[in-house]
Amino acid sequence: MRFKLLCAVIVAVSLCSCSAAADFANGPADSITMPPGNRVSQTLLAGDKLVTFRSWLDIPYVKNPVEPEYQRLNIYVPEEYFHGETINGYTAKTAPILMPNGVGGYLPGKQFIPANDTRHGTPNVALYALSKGYVVISPAIRGRTLENGKAPALIVDYKAAVRWVRHNKDRLPAGDTEKIISDGLSAGGALSSLLGATGNAKEYEPYLQAIGAEEERDDIFASVVYCPITNLENADMAYEWIFNGVNTYHMGPAREMDDNMKAASDALKAAFPAYLNSLELEGYELDDDGDGSFKEYIEGLYIAAAQKALDAGENVLGLEWLEVDEDEGKVTGVDLEEYAEWATRMKAAPAFDSLNMKSFENNEFADAHFTAYAFEHSTAEKPAMADADKIYVMNPMNFIGKEGVSTAKYWRIRHGVKDRDTSLAIPAILALKLKQAGYDADVAAVWNVPHDGNYDLPELFEWLDGICKK
């Protein structure tokens, strides 16, 4: 009976929401106000907790949208804040604002909608956040398949949404605009890292002005980053540093790399140490063979993931790439070559800037190369090189520690042990550069997890509460 009643409430409330949301969305972006006296709410079951919240949908966040269907956002506010109540120690004024993005594969991303995630068997990040007292504001974002969605459209939109939130801070019914948190996975993780790294960077200003973004700050408090497909102009080298020697790839049916791909793998692996060393990460380097303290650091991340799983009672034995002292209950070593065989290669070399210029990432750069190696060895009929300025603004590494940029203070970066969409080296490098620049970066590999995100919500929100309540 309780389930039937709840479903009826959800349906009825959802139908009413559309009208109120439409009232909120009418008019130019700079004249939007919260509808006075709005009592429309939704109720969903998050685990064993009923969560009631108000919704405003499809609000334009720029004055001159070039893709109006996407340059809109949704706002979700816990009902308790309309009655002067607290949730999880937060009030309407102190509630953090979670801004998750729905981008994947550099495709257009729709707004997150609070719901239960059938894949993980848990509430999704938006619903879970509401249950913990967070305000959720989720923008839709342009992507590579739209006429006006090529790089750097997605980060421009994300920034514009943050600016809209700050511009309307006195109109929002709840939420602390100095506690804005980004969240994303895969290309969305790259986007989350870009938003966190590039706060107020002047390089984006012409793009923001062109779409009529508000003249506000776009720095944020914290970035949540899962398996980011980022640092694209160096990601091919990092991928081959791990997967060189594994010549079968699994993008669809298993296939063997051809001679051009194998040659690319060898060359890119050989080039990675020079790139890593050029970053001058204190205490981390590689020799010409790709060995050294940075390799030991990567091995340590895998060891820590396995140890955490072992301590939790999971079986990590019987893997050729993992050394375990069963008597002591300690994971003692990792063989990265054996790891690559076990994980399997997903992508042929080059993994991101493909020689035929047909990867998702090539498409993101308007069907062009973005690395010197792929451009010089291109098999495309008409090779093209992406604009250098656009390549630059798509890489968060270029902005960490840069004068005039306000990088997020707090970072949580996760990469699954079974993930072979990109190399663990990429998020690890991001975290090390952040730490060296004085930022708080919590990075870890996660046992038995593939290319995925928001799979550890209790741990995530324990971390978020820890930084938000300081």
Language-model segments: which ranges?
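Alpha/beta-hydrolase active-site loop
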Residues: 149-171
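Short beta-strand element of the alpha/beta-hydrolase
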Residues: 73, 89-106, 110
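Short amphipathic alpha-helix adjacent to the substrate-entry channel of hydrolases
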Residues: 114-136
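Primarily recognizes the serine-hydrolase "nucleophile elbow" in alpha/beta-hydrolase
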Residues: 167-242
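Non-catalytic, alpha-helical, charged scaffold/linker segments
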Residues: 226-344
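C-terminal subdomain of alpha/beta-hydrolase-fold enzymes, centered on the catalytic histidine
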Residues: 314-469
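Catalytic-loop region of hydrolases
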Residues: 22-89
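C-terminal motif of bacterial Sec signal peptides marking the signal peptidase cleavage site
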Residues: 16-17
